[in-house]
Amino acid sequence: MKHSYIAKRFQSSGAGLSLDTEALAKYKDIIDLSIGDTDFTTDESIINAAFRDARAGHTHYGDPKGDPELIDAVCRAWEEDFGQRLPRDHVLVSASSCLGMALVMLAILDPGDEVIVFSPYFPMYREQIELAGGVCVDVPTYANEDYAIDEARLRAAITPRT
């Protein structure tokens, strides 16, 4: 195609996150654990609480740093769990873990920096790292090893760019 509306960096990518749904359709009872989309419906009490919150007027953009009550709760939980005070200005609540991870990668990676990711991993990790100019270094873990991190494989993956 002479003129494409897709950025060049995405034109040569493979299938990405797309699934071969035709191939998967022949299997029964598959639970997709790749992106955190559960195979059950959200509990009614949570749905009702969300409705109550919306009816109370919480339908507008919130503080870009996160809901102040949630930030306070995170700070309290951190102190209870780890015995350390966590300053409020060290907490940023994002709209999703994907957004949060992407922001972290964009903030800390320089082009060519390497990030070690233990596989299997959440599909978006590689894309977030590469979008920020980093290089994803895959260090495998295996079921027959209880997905434990192997120190030798980890050490072999570390370079001056890590």
What are these regions (language model features)?
Residues 8-96, 103, 153:
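N-terminal small-domain helix-loop-helix segment of the aminotransferase-like
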Residues 4, 34, 55, 78-80, ...:
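A generic, residue-level signal for flexible/boundary positions that often mark functional hotspots
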Residues 25-28, 55, 109-110, 159-162:
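Short conserved AdoMet
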Residues 100-101, 125:
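Short, hydrophobic alpha-helical packing/hinge segments within bilobed ligand-binding/sensory domains
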Residues 37, 68, 98, 122, ...:
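Residue-level detector of flexible, active-site-proximal loop/helix-junction positions
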